[in-house]
A protein has these predicted regions:
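Glycine-rich phosphate-binding loop signature in dinucleotide/nucleotide-binding domains
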Residues: 35-39, 167-170, 225
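Active-site neighborhood of phospho(di)ester-bond hydrolases with catalytic His/Asp-centered motifs
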Residues: 17-19, 43-48, 76-84, 102-104, ...
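A short, compositionally biased domain-edge/stem linker segment
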Residues: 1-8
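Short catalytic/ligand-binding loop motif for oxyanion handling, primarily in non-cytosolic enzymes
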Residues: 24-26, 52-54, 86-90, 109-112, ...
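Binuclear metal-dependent phosphoesterase catalytic core
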Residues: 9, 110-112, 216-224, 236-265
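Active-site-proximal loop/helix segment associated with metal-binding centers of metalloenzymes
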Residues: 114-212
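Extreme N-terminal starter segment of soluble prokaryotic enzymes
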Residues: 11-16
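Core catalytic region of metal-dependent phosphoesterases/phosphodiesterases
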Residues: 18, 23-112, 207-211
Length: 265
């Protein structure tokens, strides 16, 4: 497995997963480090972090503003890719600060006895609106981090080769994604989705495919005997939890909702 997609935290004493933060980086750091007084904790944001809506320097300034607080608390923040994140921050030019890093798809986080698979991406149901907005810019190859409001390569991808490589070295017990398997909430296709599907004729099929990618990842992990017990995701801006017949607990996290992943038994 590529060492750049292994994130190892032997010092960590806790793991917390956050729902979407939509650019509220300062609020997340304050909530974790000050409001809840977390220490020695790996904090993983399940997508829609907000990378790409501002210039690159903005995110460096945010990090510089918060790194002292993170260091003092001995906390680390990892950012999984959502549909509202420029994939270039995860592929071509990932952020690699000691306590603040973007996590490429099919990375493994190892902490507190857990081996956690992270796979980002989802479909923006309002993509047609975003592409017609004056703030939308066609991507330029020589400016991968240029400010924008939509990225066409936002969708999740099933990669059997990467899963095979992961299976050689790890036993995945937890997965963090942005979207979710097809049987998880939300399953309703009303509201904004129904409105946007009228204008975007491919939306229904693309969202179906997005959820099926998650189904395929689940099928792979279970059929290859990974000890999967927890699945965390964001994207839908609501909170929900359920346990399936195999004992896997699915956790949908609302915006800025935090949930602790306990130490492995």
């Amino acid at each position: 497995m590529n060492p750049e997609t292994l994130f190892d935290f032997p010092e960590a004493k806790g793991i917390v997963i956050s729902g979407d933060i939509h650019g509220e980086f300062n609020k997340l750091v304050f909530k974790c480090c000050v409001q809840y007084g977390m220490t020695d904790t790996v904090i993983i944001v399940a997508g829609d972090c907000g990378f790409g809506f501002e210039q690159q320097g903005y995110y460096e300034n945010v990090y510089n503003r918060n790194r002292g607080r993170l260091s003092k608390s001995n906390n680390w923040i990892l950012f999984v890719r959502g549909n509202h994140d420029n994939p270039a921050y995860y592929i071509e030019l990932p952020i690699k600060h000691r306590r603040w890093m973007t996590v490429p798809d099919y990375s493994v986080v190892r902490a507190c006895g857990h081996e956690i698979l992270c796979v980002g991406g989802a479909i923006s149901v309002d993509r047609s609106h975003r592409m017609n907005h004056s703030a939308y810019n066609l991507p330029k190859q020589d400016e991968p981090l240029a400010r924008n409001i939509y990225w066409a390569n936002e969708y999740p991808v099933f990669d059997a080769d990467k899963l095979d490589a992961i299976s050689e070295d790890f036993a995945i017990d937890t997965i963090i994604t942005h979207t979710a398997p097809s049987f998880c909430e939300l399953t309703s296709k009303g509201g904004l989705f129904a409105e946007m599907a009228i204008r975007d004729e491919d939306l229904t099929e693309d969202v179906k495919n997005e959820r099926q990618v998650m189904d395929r990842i689940l099928d792979y992990l279970t059929s290859n005997h990974h000890p999967l017990r927890y699945w965390f995701y964001g994207h839908f801006h609501q909170s929900w939890q359920a346990i399936d017949n195999e004992g896997i607990q699915y956790n949908m996290l609302d915006i800025m909702e935090l949930k602790e992943l306990g130490a492995k038994d």
